[in-house]
Amino acid sequence: MMKIDNILISHLHGDHVFGIFGLLSTLGMLGRTAPLHIYAPRDFSSILHFWQGHFGEGVAYEIVHHLLSAKAPEVICETRTVDVLAFPLNHGIDTFGFLFREKWPLDRAGNPMRLGRSAAYCSDTAPFPEESEWLKGVDLIYHEATYGEEMHDKAIARYHSTAARAATVAREAGAKQLVLGHFSSRYKDLTPLLEEARAIFPETVLAQESGRYVIPIPERL
């Protein structure tokens, strides 16, 4: 937990942001001193300041809010091994997806030794034209699938996706794997959602709590 340096928040609906404040408090109690960078939509700043003023006593480390405002995929964070890009989603409020691109060391000619792997996180979103294009060639996509296609109209009205729509994005993007998540609680059995997606994009699985999804290391160039 203490190794966390960067946190990404897609949007400010409660199911995507409330949990962070317990984490911030825990890091403070554990004696964190290193700055923590949080990438989030504009209004997170006022929420953070409220929390710091009322509940942040004893939190000695710096919390840096980086405003997300991308209109198309753009790099927001770089580490030695990964570039993180943000891009806008379609959810009725400021909402962002994230694209992770692996970086490999360069050879003597200045070229990457391997092709970097990639993964995309698409949280709450209704369909929009640019999504598949922005994710072209990605290895793995996590995509929300709140509803089945039988509830297509409700999905659109609430700025969400169906399992079929998520699978269509993966197919059009040329992805290798699709992980579905963010299911409506109305579904006690998720098998129909999985089957709906696999009819369009066979390499689909359902997200699991603490699940791990392997992206194979590519051959050397």
Q: What is each residue range found by the language model?
A:
Residues 32-69, 186:
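Active-site neighborhood of divalent metal-dependent phosphoester bond hydrolases
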Residues 69-181, 189-200, 216-221:
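Metal-dependent phosphodiesterase/nuclease catalytic metal-binding core
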Residues 25, 53, 168:
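Short, well-ordered alpha-helices that flank and scaffold nucleotide-derived cofactor binding pockets
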Residues 20-23, 48-51, 131, 197:
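Hydrophobic packing residues within well-ordered alpha-helices of enzyme cores
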Residues 207-219:
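Binuclear metal-dependent phosphoesterase catalytic core
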Residues 62-65, 84, 204:
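Generic structural signal for residues in well-ordered beta-strands
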Residues 4-13, 41, 120-125, 142-144, ...:
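Active-site neighborhood of phospho(di)ester-bond hydrolases with catalytic His/Asp-centered motifs
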Residues 1-39, 67-69:
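Active-site metal-binding motif and surrounding structural segment of the metallo-beta-lactamase
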